[in-house]
């Protein structure tokens, strides 16, 4: 399958530059897979599509202030993006321009914080050891790691879901940005159940698909965790005959990863599961997601779930109706 099959025309002004206030006032496109029908709603109306006993599964990973600006002793500017914590104060990072940072290169962030390069990781990453080795201090100096298509500085809390709690992502699991505490409360009152997983969104989010054949693309590994209580709730939802509704593509990848493993009480590991058409979904019955970049692995996942032709038609409709796209954009519910 060709990557070009997942391309579409997007006027740049439809790329959302800031989030909607309140969060649940964004638009919601509802896709009915069985009837191939499309509806246009407001996100808070999602409650009308969920039944008592349905299970909403949230990725509670929290975005870290992963972007840092440093200088070499020569005065050259270097941008650092924290990717993965190896131990306290030692991180796998992306650095730009990379060719200027070799083993032994010292980087000064400010008078309180510096780093030295211990060597190269795979994928052109660098291993940096910070001085002092204090993650709290590193996070204090860091900024929101916004995607390159967002031009404005946005406070970290608006690039964070209201339920985020496990630090480790370098990009937000954006489908969750539409939920407010009030909407969650209303859903609970209706009898909708909630469960949590963790998948720390990693470097793959910033990396475009560079191959022409979809099947040749390799995903980066990302850490995930599914606690005992969630495993129990997933099983009980299945037994009741209710739906498992994944909030976000990261949640889908976590659930479909564990669906392919031997049964366990809880799950912790790394996944590089790449979902593209055709794909047999074993756990996920419905999906809440955003509008994704052309040719992206996220769009391929959505196409695998709802059917490529139907999804590409829905995207053309979204452009026509001036939906807002990408991280701060509108949402889609696929039933």
UniProtKB/Swiss-Prot annotation:
InterPro entries in the cross-refs: QueA, QueA_dom1, QueA_dom2, QueA_sf
Highest taxon of the lineage: Bacteria
Subcellular location, principal: cytoplasm
Residues in the signal sequence: none
Keywords: Cytoplasm, Queuosine biosynthesis, S-adenosyl-L-methionine, Transferase
Subunit structure: Monomer.
Family: Belongs to the QueA family.
Main function: Transfers and isomerizes the ribose moiety from AdoMet to the 7-aminomethyl group of 7-deazaguanine (preQ1-tRNA) to give epoxyqueuosine (oQ-tRNA).
The protein, known as: S-adenosylmethionine:tRNA ribosyltransferase-isomerase
Organism from which the protein derives: Thermotoga maritima (strain ATCC 43589 / DSM 3109 / JCM 10099 / NBRC 100826 / MSB8)
Lineage: Bacteria, Thermotogati, Thermotogota, Thermotogae, Thermotogales
This protein's encoding gene: queA
